[in-house]
Amino acid sequence: MKDLTERQRKVLLFIEEFIEKNGYPPSVREIARRFRITPRGALLHLIALEKKGYIERKNGKPRALRVSKSIRNKIPLIGEIRAGEKREAVEYLEDYIEIPESFLSSGYDHFLLKVKGESMIEEHICDGDLVLVRRQDWAQNGDIVVAMVDGEVTLKKFYQRGDTVELRPANREMSSMFFKAEKVKILGKVVGVFRKL
């Protein structure tokens, strides 16, 4: 999965969803229209996906393609997050990991982060775990969130009172962090935890 660019991944997902909804694959023009690119650009993406083994095409026939390797439930692992102090936000694609569909919220993007640190151990989120994050820009009190403050990200429980946000660890040995609400950007809500035994 590392061999797909982000745009190729999105094109492949679009093809899969289009087939599921309509019963047949999209045309090159429909792909181009969806991504606001030229038909030639769409064709180049299809050629790349075919070379990488994700689709099969029959040359010269419209809509003659099929998906040979699905990525529907493959979620991007985009790096690490500290469950402790804040850390500079660096997003880089490490891999794609297949996640059961029942873990995914319909209509939302998801991503995975590898946890570093012990600030969330009382919520059973440990060093080395993978957290499944539903991408959203809001949170309710008590949600476990990925939050960004001054360009740095952290994994904490979210509480807001008035214009003050508390990012609270789930470890009694650590202290909460308090910020003005406008300084805190929610990147997503944790909806699952995966651990190797």
UniProtKB/Swiss-Prot annotation:
If you read the UniProt record, what top EC class would you report for this enzyme, in one word? hydrolase
Residues in the DNA-binding region are 28-47
Q: Which InterPro entries match?
A: LexA, LexA-like, LexA/Signal_pep-like_sf, LexA_DNA-bd_dom, LexA_repressor, Peptidase_S24_LexA, Peptidase_S24_S26A/B/C, WH-like_DNA-bd_sf
Marked site: Cleavage: A83, G84
* UniProt GO MF annotations: DNA binding; serine-type endopeptidase activity
E.C. no? 3.4.21.88
According to UniProt, the reaction catalysed is: Hydrolysis of Ala-|-Gly bond in repressor LexA
Q: Which domain of life is it from?
A: Bacteria
Give TM segment ranges: none
GO BP annotations of the record are: DNA repair; DNA replication; negative regulation of DNA-templated transcription; proteolysis; SOS response
Cited Gene3D superfamilies:
Umud Fragment, subunit A, Winged helix-like DNA-binding domain superfamily/Winged helix DNA-binding domain
User: Which residues does the entry assign to the active site, renumbered to this chain?
Assistant: S119 (for autocatalytic cleavage activity), K156 (for autocatalytic cleavage activity)
Mind listing the UniProt keywords for this protein, alphabetically? Autocatalytic cleavage, DNA damage, DNA repair, DNA replication, DNA-binding, Hydrolase, Repressor, SOS response, Transcription, Transcription regulation
Instruction: Return the similarity comment.
Output: Belongs to the peptidase S24 family.
Function description: Represses a number of genes involved in the response to DNA damage (SOS response), including recA and lexA. In the presence of single-stranded DNA, RecA interacts with LexA causing an autocatalytic cleavage which disrupts the DNA-binding part of LexA, leading to derepression of the SOS regulon and eventually DNA repair.
Complex formation: Homodimer.
Protein name as annotated: LexA repressor
